[in-house]
Amino acid sequence: MGREFGNLTRMRHVISYSLSPFEQRAHPHVFTKGIPNVLRRFRESFFRVAPQFVVFYLIYTWGTEEFERSKRKNPAAYENDK
């Protein structure tokens, strides 16, 4: 054993690179590249996703209205009862 945690085994042919936490920036290019990229991705995927949501919303509203209508009694069925 004798090795410290993190260096428990020696791995051959594996190269890893790392930066010191003091050399890294927390959020590089968030405002210059990140937000425009989010807007671009939204525009690209909007017309693929939006029609499905519209169809789902129309079917859902139709289904709830039809359900509420079917719960009511039909007054024409009780006109001749006395």
From Swiss-Prot:
One GO location term (cellular component): respiratory chain complex III
Signal peptide: none
Biological processes annotated in GO: mitochondrial electron transport, ubiquinol to cytochrome c
Mitochondrial matrix membrane side: 1-39
Localization annotation: Mitochondrion inner membrane
Topological domain spans for side Mitochondrial intermembrane: 69-82
Keywords associated with the record: Acetylation, Electron transport, Membrane, Mitochondrion, Mitochondrion inner membrane, Phosphoprotein, Respiratory chain, Transmembrane, Transmembrane helix, Transport
List of residues that carry N6-succinyllysine: K33
Transmembrane stretches, start-end: 40-68
Main location: mitochondrion
Modified residues (N6-acetyllysine): K33
SUPFAM superfamilies (UniProt xref): Ubiquinone-binding protein QP-C of cytochrome bc1 complex (Ubiquinol-cytochrome c reductase)
InterPro entries referenced in this protein's UniProt entry, alphabetically: Cyt_bc1_su8, Cyt_bc1_su8_sf
Membrane topology: Single-pass membrane protein
Domain of life, per lineage: Eukaryota
Residue positions where Phosphoserine is found in the record: S16
Assembly and interaction partners: Component of the ubiquinol-cytochrome c oxidoreductase (cytochrome b-c1 complex, complex III, CIII), a multisubunit enzyme composed of 11 subunits. The complex is composed of 3 respiratory subunits cytochrome b, cytochrome c1 and Rieske protein UQCRFS1, 2 core protein subunits UQCRC1/QCR1 and UQCRC2/QCR2, and 6 low-molecular weight protein subunits UQCRH/QCR6, UQCRB/QCR7, UQCRQ/QCR8, UQCR10/QCR9, UQCR11/QCR10 and subunit 9, the cleavage product of Rieske protein UQCRFS1.
Role: Component of the ubiquinol-cytochrome c oxidoreductase, a multisubunit transmembrane complex that is part of the mitochondrial electron transport chain which drives oxidative phosphorylation.
Similarity annotation: Belongs to the UQCRQ/QCR8 family.
Name listed for the protein in its UniProt record: Cytochrome b-c1 complex subunit 8
Organism encoding this protein: Pongo abelii (Sumatran orangutan)
